[in-house]
Amino acid sequence: MARSQQEASIAQIMASRTGTDPADWFLVFKARYGMQVAFEEIYAEMGAGEVATQLLTCCTAVDPILVAGLVPRYCEVSFDTAMIDSEALDASGELRAVVAQHTYGIVDDAATARLAQRAHDAGALLVEDCAHCVGRMAKDESGEPLADISFHSFGIEKMLHTLLGGAV
């Protein structure tokens, strides 16, 4: 994929902050549009099903699930992490993805690892919502990202002084 100099620069910055490869970063007009494309691909590859998410979220994080033809399954939130409680997660049925939302910028690697394990054991993907902590991701002990897909928002109300944008 051909990138402009500015796109390559942002991909390099995101990669350096997260310990990932710049080639793995894709810029989008809004993070929710990147989420929509990812959920549409999940639907195309895995078929109809559910995405585990939480009520403590924004409608812009749920709309892409619905637009892609998937169904949100609202889950219990952990008091300690403000994300889906991995112990309470019902991973049965037609689960296609689990959203690890780092609410308030809380990135708990151990809790995310447990959530990733539950998702993967169910044959689902772990989708990481880093809208509140752009440039940070949950990682395993070796420093590798735990999520299969990670979204970062550059929206006006987020951490960066931009009007629009996001990265997948």
Regions found by a protein language model. Name each.
Residues 15, 65, 117-119:
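A generic structural signal for well-ordered alpha-helical segments
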Residues 23-25, 48-51, 165:
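Short active-site oxyanion
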Residues 25, 72, 126:
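Hydrophobic anchor at the start of a short beta-strand
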Residues 80-168:
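Active-site phosphate-binding strand-loop segment of PLP-dependent enzymes
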Residues 1-33, 41, 56:
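Conserved N-terminal alpha-helix of the aminotransferase class I/II PLP-enzyme fold
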Residues 38-92:
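Conserved PLP-anchoring active-site segment centered on the Schiff-base-forming lysine
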Residues 3, 7, 11, 58, ...:
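A structural signal for well-ordered alpha-helical scaffolds and beta->alpha junctions
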